[in-house]
UniProtKB/Swiss-Prot annotation:
GO terms for biological process: mitochondrial translation. The gene is rps16. Keywords: Chloroplast, Plastid, Ribonucleoprotein, Ribosomal protein. It is found in: Plastid, Chloroplast. This is Small ribosomal subunit protein bS16c. GO terms for cellular component: chloroplast; mitochondrion; small ribosomal subunit. Belongs to the bacterial ribosomal protein bS16 family. It comes from Porphyra purpurea (Red seaweed). Its main location: plastid. GO terms for molecular function: structural constituent of ribosome.
Length: 82
């Protein structure tokens, strides 16, 4: 199953994450199928390729809870309860 999740990179105590599509059985920092965006929790900076994310979601990719929250904040996907 393909999941949209975060892949950590950056220095110690200064994490940055790439939003990637990868197999759910892969390691957190393993090989990604496709890079879809960027998230920095320290500066709260987010860059997202909306077209690629929507394409992956239409193909049946699942999101992790954190990525879903990031996409909700960016108003890319609607909240389920709304």
């Amino acid at each position: 199953m393909v999941k949209l999740r975060l892949k950590r990179y950056g220095r110690k105590q200064q994490p940055s994450y790439r939003i990637v599509a990868m197999d759910s059985r892969s390691k957190r920092d393993g090989k990604a199928i496709e890079e879809l965006g960027f998230y920095n929790p320290i500066t709260n900076e987010t860059r997202i390729d909306i077209a690629k994310i929507l394409k992956r979601l239409k193909q049946g990719a699942q999101t992790t809870r954190t990525v879903k929250n990031i996409l909700n904040e960016a108003q890319i996907i609607a909240k389920e309860n709304s």
